[in-house]
A protein has these predicted regions:
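Residue-level detection of beta-strand scaffold positions
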Residues: 11-13, 17-20, 75, 79
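Conserved HGGG/HGGXW glycine-rich cap/lid loop of the alpha/beta-hydrolase fold
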Residues: 14-63
Length: 88
């Protein structure tokens, strides 16, 4: 897995990808409220061959701290879209 960052005006979001060299479908893992990216370590490891995989530490969770608590669910969707755009 490769750790990457996505900068916002409220803080930095950390996310991890496991992507192959060829074009293949993406699997996106979104940990729940009390978890971080480590929740999906085994899935990322096992599915990282036939799929591109991405997992994040949501804003204000795990490595994505500190993060100002001034964001909405709509903002989180925009952040994810920005990450998807960055990853192609």
């Amino acid at each position: 897995m490769t750790e990457k960052v996505f900068d916002t005006t409220l803080g930095t979001i950390h996310y991890w990808v496991q992507a192959g060299e060829r074009v293949q479908p993406w699997l996106i893992f979104l940990p729940g409220l009390t978890a971080d990216h480590r929740l999906f370590d085994k899935q990322m490891e096992g599915l990282g061959g036939p799929y591109n995989c991405l997992v994040w530490d949501a804003p204000a969770h795990g490595a994505s701290r500190p993060f100002r608590l001034e964001f909405s669910l709509e903002d989180m969707a925009r952040y994810l879209d920005g990450i998807f755009q960055a990853e192609g």
